[in-house]
């Protein structure tokens, strides 16, 4: 008794399930056999556009495996893949035709070759440019066999290019000028360790017939004769971002030439450069500057910072790494507090600021949301207590390598009402107990201290970096994970670069934490 009704209900439920998950609508009560349902490939009902959209959510390995499922998936994967990264050895040249027959929609291409291998040639690069006419972003790394002529042929075919990044290549100024001449839509240019640029190289400039330029960002890194870019930097009216990092030679004159033109610069990064207060005085003429990084420039002093503060009143983000030279201190920071009232982010590394300047900044810069104080012997409990009392808008606060004790951290329990993240590192007097106590007092505050992290060493672009993972219980037992990184010793290539740079050699203490804070809050800061 009860067996027959149960069997009927079970059968009806199975048929209902088939109707629910099958995309085929059975008309007129037509039934579908279970065997046919199992054998049916329902992905065949998906349009190619939907299948391509699904592929976009897969990682690189999963997407490669999916492309081997059937011929259709292989075709859809090739037609919908817009980003491609290739090992640019010379042996790849014979496969380029078949490769780009499959991947015919590539818009972002990266070609990388290791130092021990022979890279692809000018002919191979020209073939790529013919097959990929819609390229908008190109990255070349270690392609030492590519010459100026190869870059010129490439530029003639890739006229839609918007972003170009080259590093460790052997072509020179002629190749860069060819890109500027033919790629009218180019917006971002990044040049790193370009060996073809030497003292006898021609100047890099916009073409004479160029009525306007689309260039918005230029990054020059580790160049021996980077001053050849002076005409380009001085005449590009659309330029918004300029980064000059670890380049040899005197850069004061270049900055003066930029300032004498009608500059639209809003972001300037100067790192490990031979630049003095003369260069900072030139930067002060760029009144639209909102972001300024002065990192390990030992000839810069309070006088240069005062020039900038008095004229660049739109300044929102200021990073200073004084390299413990004691040339930038209270005097320059007091000027920042007086004139830069829109300041939202301040990072001080190796700067001996005291209660005097920090109190002025805390009182006057009412929009200050992100603050980092690192490697200063003059920042103690008094300074932290002052910040806690006066920085009402502060949201993220980092203290690293300063003589701060538990008493200073205690002040943050009642101060800085909008604080959401606190990081305390390498402060030897601070104990772990104060961190636990602070979490109890402010349950919405994420507190990260030395005892909370585990480190792992990884290699990124040939340079050793330390990745720090910091799991910490926040409110209601939730886990907050945060990743930070800082540059470590580095391999032989990095050591060679540092030995060439002489006085510029040293360890970069600017951690990714500050960059991440800046990027995460960029949208909210600009509104």
UniProtKB/Swiss-Prot annotation:
One short Pfam family name for this protein? F-box-like
| Biological source species | Arabidopsis thaliana
One GO CC annotation? nucleus
List the SUPFAM superfamilies.
F-box domain, RNI-like
What SMART domains does the database record attribute to this sequence? LRR_CC
Q: Which InterPro entries match?
A: F-box-like_dom_sf, F-box_dom, Leu-rich_rpt, Leu-rich_rpt_Cys-con_subtyp, LRR_dom_sf
Q: Which UniProt keywords apply?
A: Nucleus, Ubl conjugation pathway
Subunit description: Part of a SCF (ASK-cullin-F-box) protein ligase complex. Interacts with SKP1A/ASK1, SKP1B/ASK2 and ASK11.
GO biological-process terms attached to the record: protein ubiquitination
Write out the pathway annotation from the protein's UniProt entry. Protein modification; protein ubiquitination
User: What is the documented function of this protein?
Assistant: Component of SCF(ASK-cullin-F-box) E3 ubiquitin ligase complexes, which may mediate the ubiquitination and subsequent proteasomal degradation of target proteins.
**Keyword Nucleus among record annotations:** yes
Give this protein's Gene Ontology molecular function annotations: ubiquitin-protein transferase activity
Q: What is the recorded name of this protein?
A: F-box protein SKIP2
